[in-house]
């Protein structure tokens, strides 16, 4: 699976039991086949587990972050951003969508701190709080 080496070097599946179980189930069921999903949460090594589960489920995944242009800035680890891009996953900023260089054609957006609240997903938003 995507990112297995990086994840396994840092975490034991017992540390993320729900996402581990979901990835195992979703790899055969593929509930997200054909869905374009934007995940806009802080980008760090631990969020690779979330991406891995969504990819196992067939998601056409994009990872997004705001660099503050829309009033919100969410942190990210540039090393992990590069790793994601090296694995062929689209990384977009809110500014990319605002200026039209990336289409606002997502089916589902998982959004932390409202970074992409101006978008119009076909299926809807999942609001993930910044407070934890």
Write out the residue ranges for each language-model feature.
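N-terminal ligand-binding/catalytic initiation module
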Residues: 1-132
């Amino acid at each position: 699976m995507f990112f297995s080496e990086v994840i396994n070097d840092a975490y034991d599946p017992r540390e993320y039991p729900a996402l581990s179980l979901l990835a195992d189930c979703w790899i055969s069921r593929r509930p997200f086949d054909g869905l374009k999903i934007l995940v806009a949460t802080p980008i760090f090594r631990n969020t690779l587990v979330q991406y891995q589960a969504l990819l196992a489920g067939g998601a056409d995944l994009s990872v997004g972050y705001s660099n503050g242009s829309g009033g919100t800035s969410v942190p990210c680890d540039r090393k992990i951003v590069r790793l994601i891009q090296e694995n062929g996953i689209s990384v977009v900023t809110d500014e990319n969508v605002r200026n039209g260089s990336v289409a606002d054609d997502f089916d589902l957006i998982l959004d932390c701190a409202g970074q992409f609240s101006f978008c119009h997903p076909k299926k809807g938003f999942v609001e993930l709080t910044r407070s934890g």
